[in-house]
Amino acid sequence: MKPAMETAAEENTEQSQERKGCFECCIKCLGGVPYASLVATILCFSGVALFCGCGHVALAGTVAILEQHFSTNASDHALLSEVIQLMQYVIYGIASFFFLYGIILLAEGFYTTSAVKELHGEFKTTACGRCISGMFVFLTYVLGVAWLGVFGFSAVPVFMFYNIWSTCEVIKSPQTNGTTGVEQICVDIRQYGIIPWNAFPGKICGSALENICNTNEFYMSYHLFIVACAGAGATVIALLIYMMATTYNYAVLKFKSREDCCTKF
C-alpha cells in the first residue's frame, strides 16, 4: 500500500500533465489557423455585402430620379434601365460567387497552413494539392485586377452625385440665395452620357434642382453609392491579403516539396 501523500502527489502529477497536454493541443490547433485568410475572408464578405446590397438599392434610386426629373420620356432611358436591371442581376451573381469563393479560400488556407507548419507529423503534400494552390493564386490575382476595375467604376456615380450635390450647395449658399442668377445654375445629366442628348428635359436648374437634392431618393442613393464604393475598396484589400497569403503558402509548399530541401522559410 502506498502512502496517501504519494498517491495524492501522483494524481496531481497526472492532472498537471493532462492539463499541459490539453494546453499544448490547443496551442497546436491555434497554430494551424490561417489568420491572414481569416481576416481576408471577413473583410471580403463585408466588402461584397456592402457593395452588392447598397449598390442594388442605389441603382434603383437612380432610375427613379432619372424617370421623375431628368427623362420623362421612357423611350429615352429605356437602354439605361435595361443595363441597370442587368447590373442588378449581376450583383446577385457576384454575391453568391464570392460567398462560395471566400469559403473555399479559407479552407485552402487551413490546408496549406497546416502543411507548411507540419502540424500533422511528417510533411506530406501531393502534386495535385500544389497545383490547386497555384490555381487559387492565379485566380485570386485575376479577381484582384478585376475588382480594381470595379472599384474605379463604382466611383463614377459617386462623382456624378457629388457634382449635383455641390451644385445644390452653391444654390443654397447666402451669396446666391434670392438672386436672379440662381435659375441660371443648372445640372445637365446628358453630359455624362447616361441618357441621350435628345432626352427631355435633361437639364434641371435653380429651385427645381434644389428640390431634387432635398428628396429622399437623392439623399439615399448618394450615400449608398459612397458605401458601395467603400465596400468595393474593402474587397480589393481583402483580395490583396488573399494574394499574399496564397502566394506565400504556395511558394513554401513548392520549396518544401523538393527533395534537396533542408531549410525552412
Swiss-Prot record:
Glycans are attached at N73, N177. The keyword Membrane applies. One of its GO terms (cellular component) is myelin sheath. Keywords: Cell membrane, Developmental protein, Differentiation, Glycoprotein, Membrane, Neurogenesis, Osteogenesis, Phosphoprotein, Protein transport, Transmembrane, Transmembrane helix, Transport. It is found in: Cell membrane. The chain crosses the membrane at residues 31-51, 90-110, 136-156, 224-244. PROSITE patterns: MYELIN_PLP_1, MYELIN_PLP_2. The keyword Transmembrane helix applies. Disulfide bonds: none annotated. Neurons and glia; cerebellar Bergmann glia, in glia within white matter tracts of the cerebellum and cerebrum, and in embryonic dorsal root ganglia. One of its GO terms (molecular function) is structural constituent of myelin sheath. It is a multi-pass membrane protein. GO terms for biological process: axon development; central nervous system myelination; extracellular matrix assembly; negative regulation of protein localization to cell surface; negative regulation of serotonin uptake; nervous system development; ossification; positive regulation of bone mineralization. The modification Phosphoserine is found at S257. PANTHER family: MYELIN PROTEOLIPID (PTHR11683), NEURONAL MEMBRANE GLYCOPROTEIN M6-B (PTHR11683:SF10). Belongs to the myelin proteolipid protein family. May be involved in neural development. Involved in regulation of osteoblast function and bone formation. Involved in matrix vesicle release by osteoblasts; this function seems to involve maintenance of the actin cytoskeleton. May be involved in cellular trafficking of SERT and thereby in regulation of serotonin uptake. Interacts with SERT. This is Neuronal membrane glycoprotein M6-b. It comes from Homo sapiens (Human).
